């Protein structure tokens, strides 16, 4: 018997990967950090310029964590970018060290295998401009030495295992379909909402498990469920942060009788919603803002966050928190700071280019920046990787 493996892609919500993954022995995906930065991450030009040769610092990790949840934890990188590709709007070469970093990041997130696409750059046909580990003349391309370095390092490395993360993040394909059908704003995108939350968690130094809405919140210090179309009654038993748009529709995409959010235990109703253009964010009292989306609330629950104008921005009843808008990065961080002590989370304030991944036994640090960075007495060069025993 041989295992059945299939490869997924980045930012694709056209089918439910959990359902397909349940029929596979191993899920895999195609990781093209630089190509994805320019054609699907949604980064502005400043970020694209800064990460042009490295890729977005969270996009690969997001998909590692997502696809780890689709086949009982078994996953590969089926295609890893080794150099310039042939299909992105522009196709730069990686910063030296990045092919090694991308591979180590995948292994730190639990990958069993990292395969490069491709072995040799073909001198013919439609992909002849797609780099490989070998040039068309069969001589080594720049990434070959880095792949060999990773192989040598792996041979000496201990088995680090995959630890349960302290926080969970719900990703739900039905919600993606629903908000694609009814965005109510030109830039309301479910993937982007969840990804913004993920980025905020990673900037705080947290490892994340991405899971379907069947997650057991009692297994995590906090479970985040932004934009979740319907909120099952089972989503309780631990601290949960839901919203915006969570529980706002039925499975038939109708407004619940009595209005949303249809979340067990909450005494809060959304009376109307408004989508916000990029030039009109709504400031939060104390810092941060809602962008793209805001909901007006009637509530008998405790208000834990206000808009600058005084209206409720987030409410809480017991272990359920509902946030009535799409927070910017500062807004997400304020919410995390508010909850961290009760949840028993130790938060960091990582430099923009630095990311941390914790395994059973080790901490892995990754510098996605084009320059060296120092944090907590650790200095990583550009495209640097560092690991230490916990």
Predicted regions and their residues:
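Short, well-ordered secondary-structure micro-motifs within conserved domains or adaptor modules
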Residues: 28, 217-230
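Catalytic cores of secreted or luminal carbohydrate-active enzymes
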Residues: 139-158, 200, 321-343
